[in-house]
């Protein structure tokens, strides 16, 4: 079957061709005992990064994967795909996130992902992503990020969020607003198809890199938007407090 001509592929053939011709390139460095950590750019301590991971289900055909993105430019700077235990994966994630300027660390919290998250929390990594317990990201949930009873560690992929996550990656690819450099990710994207209305890997192929990339782009948009709204809200609250404080001081001077 010619997937490019079938009309069932999630990502348009012309967009795939654009990315392959414009951005795809070999990594500058292959790291790790298995050589599966591909690095295109080293850390720049003036930048903010996010590390977004998908934990293997544990079967023989599944992989654990993560991407590192420059948050500001949506540029893929590193990528991992390999076979590794959930606990060891947690240690790898803490190490690489710490290396990349204490990056925001996002790990899907479904099923076996909890074992990885528990290891990250045991290592006391401070910049772990939390999701709202009601699965709805709002300014209020962002402002409550330190009230852990209102949040759950990791990213919650659900029947509601999965289509939104994939739609966000489709949008980024269509608008050419993300820089993807990985041949491995491109290969997954070419066999990512619509099947009974659901986007998924073709039989006998994987989508680990796609899902971690899509999650990164979704969280990037959500986190940046909520951070800005939260900052605006905080400034408004501070301004209101300062005005109230000034009025109170004026009243006290009058009374005095």
Labelled PLM ranges:
Residues 141-153:
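Surface-exposed intrinsically disordered loops and tails
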Residues 1-133, 139-140, 159, 163-167, ...:
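RNase H-like, metal-dependent nuclease domains and their acidic two-metal-ion catalytic environment used
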Residues 152-155, 172:
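Structured lumen-facing ectodomains of secretory-pathway proteins
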